[in-house]
Amino acid sequence: YTLRYLDKLEDEIKSRYKGELVDTIYIGGGTPSSLSLLELRRLFDIIKIFKLKDKYEATIECNIEDICIDKLKLFKDNNINRLSIGVESFDKDNLSYLSKSTLIL
């Protein structure tokens, strides 16, 4: 379903985007880092529709459990220059209740 959603997202952007210069790309909401490499590549292809200013910020929200070397390389290759890594809690009991793994810092 995700690839079909991305196809519809591309259709929507193409129908509404008028070519304005963009200074911020924010990929977030629903933890996009949980997408597969194939899905992320498709998303980055869609984002290339936008015309970016010379200086821009490109952010992607990440769940620490979803980050791997391949995804970090993909982010870098697609000019993501900021990661937003959310923290649900530093309390072990809260993490257990939320069914999240514990991150030792």
Give short role names for the model-derived ranges:
Residues 1-105:
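Conserved non-cysteine loop/helix-boundary elements of the Radical SAM core domain that shape
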